[in-house]
UniProtKB/Swiss-Prot annotation:
Name of encoding gene: coaD
Pathway: Cofactor biosynthesis; coenzyme A biosynthesis; CoA from (R)-pantothenate: step 4/5
Role, per record: Reversibly transfers an adenylyl group from ATP to 4'-phosphopantetheine, yielding dephospho-CoA (dPCoA) and pyrophosphate.
Primary localization: cytoplasm
Positions of ATP binding: S9, F10, H17, E98, Y122, S123, F124, L125, S126, S127, S128
Keywords recorded for this protein, A-Z: ATP-binding, Coenzyme A biosynthesis, Cytoplasm, Magnesium, Nucleotide-binding, Nucleotidyltransferase, Transferase
Protein name according to UniProt: Phosphopantetheine adenylyltransferase
Protein origin, superkingdom: Bacteria
GO MF annotation list: ATP binding; pantetheine-phosphate adenylyltransferase activity
The keyword Magnesium belongs to this UniProt entry's keyword annotation: yes
NCBIfam families: coaD_prev_kdtB, cyt_tran_rel
Subcellular location: Cytoplasm
Site feature Transition state stabilizer, where: H17
Length: 164
């Protein structure tokens, strides 16, 4: 069985992420979407909130599961019998960074990284851009799944209320 992992911080998950997950699911028997838990980096959403949004966004795919991990991705891959890592490339600058990570992951574990080029309509899209637009009440409906849009609006309303 070919099992692959799509790792990321997904803060929040975007339509670009979903496009890569969809394409990976078509090409592989099983896809694990793995949310990196980085205790040194404070995101907008908690790991559990990210898992919830990802589960909702990927519920149409029978062969996709969602998990979280901390530590090295290759250790997660070994523990879950993953044969390859799937990463998206939006630009040449993505390639430079991703190639270094892929080579290190291979050196550490022998696990290959498969690169999928981003759909051109999502090549500009990033979670940080979505957060910035949503923070100022901009329209993110074309950038994220509907449930994620709702969660973004609720999160920023909660933060505004908290910060007075």
């Amino acid at each position: 069985m070919r099992r692959v992992v799509c790792p990321g911080s997904f803060d929040p998950v975007t339509n670009g992420h979903i496009d890569i997950i969809r394409r990976a699911a078509k090409q592989n028997e099983e896809v694990i979407v793995a949310v990196l838990v980085n205790v040194n980096k404070r995101g907008l959403f908690t790991a559990d909130e990210k898992l919830e949004m990802l589960r909702e966004a990927t519920k149409e795919f029978d062969n996709v599961t969602v998990a979280k991990f901390d530590g090295l991705l290759v250790d997660f891959c070994r523990a879950h019998d993953v044969s390859a890592i799937v990463r998206s490339l939006r630009s040449v600058s993505d390639f430079d960074y991703e190639l270094q990570i892929a080579q290190m992951n291979y050196q550490l574990s022998g696990i290959d990284t498969l690169f999928l080029t981003a759909n051109p309509k999502y090549s500009f899209l990033s979670s940080s851009l979505v957060r910035e637009i949503a923070q100022y009440n901009g329209d993110v409906s074309a950038l994220v799944p509907p449930y994620v849009e709702e969660r973004l609006r609720a999160k920023y309303a909660e933060l505004a209320k908290k910060n007075g």
